Amino acid sequence: TYHNNNEEHTFIFLNRSLQNEHTVDLTDREAVLSYFEKHKFDYIIHLAADVGGLFKNLNGNTIIFSNNIKINENVLEACVKNGIQRGIFILSSCIFPAEPSKFPMNETMIHESAPHYSNEGYAYAKRMMHMQCQQYNKSLHTEFICLVPVNLYGPYDNFNPENSHLIPGLLHRFHNNKATGESMVAYGSGKPLRQMLYAADFAKIIYHSLFDKSIKRQTIICCNDEEFEIKDIVHHLTLTMDINYDNIQWNTNMSDGCMKKTVDNSLCKELFPDFEFTPFEIGIQKTYEWY
């Protein structure tokens, strides 16, 4: 239970790993509709997705697309049928065009052209959710706000080497390699550019966006001003983990994914001018300490 402007809010977290009354298969339409009808929520924060890192996406675009279409359609239908007028829906910077007309990309460019081929399933499902939110906002006057984070990292991440994102995948692998004395390998050339966002910072932005009623139906890119080559991210990790960076081997036979997907945070800074982002080196330190 949290308090905001003298209002008390109780948050219920749906988690498929916890077997309780709040365990719901979001791909099951009837289960989702029944659950929402039972609990009568006032707001929603829609974080759920079938999601993973580059190599999960490359190998599973079809099922990822199908699962996310079902999840998003079911959740949105349940919201509308049960009178939920306001909520936060999470997109991702990876849904932006692979070859945009300009950098940095802003919120108006999401549907400008095709996403990177490695991420088509997830990207198109999220783009469709974005369109659904916009259509509901127009026709039913809902206040469905779409937030667009860049690469997230932090405690409680998915560190499974089979389907994790960039930082948790590297951290897990380097930690194990250091313990066993095995060679440390990073995938690709290290040249792609990435913007990073500490997960706890994003959680604060979600909370503020939900309860700041001046924010109505916007799509908001969420990030700070920092951008790194992947090799620089690896260097930060090695410093944090007390590893000699010169020992890192780069497997350039592995895909780099999208080389650049820089997005514009102007609207974020306008809406949250006093927000203090966690510096990358501190976020990495906190993540490794938790791990």
Where on the chain are the PLM-derived regions?
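NAD(P)-dependent short-chain dehydrogenase/reductase
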Residues: E99-T108, M131-H208, H235-M241
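Conserved cofactor-binding/catalytic machinery of classical short-chain dehydrogenase/reductase
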Residues: D28, Y43, N67-N74, R86, ...
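Conserved Rossmann-fold NAD(P)-dependent oxidoreductase catalytic core, especially the SDR/UDP-sugar
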Residues: E73-N119, I145
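SDR active-site strand-loop-helix element
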Residues: L14, I44-D50, G87-S93, L147-P149
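C-terminal substrate-binding subdomain of Rossmann-fold SDR/epimerase-dehydratase oxidoreductases
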Residues: N176-Y291
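Adenosine-cofactor binding site in Rossmann-like domains, unifying the SAM/SAH pocket
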Residues: Y2, N6-V32
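NAD(P)H-binding glycine-rich loop region in Rossmannoid oxidoreductase-like domains
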Residues: L26-N68, K81
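Active-site helix of classical SDR
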Residues: G121, A125-M128
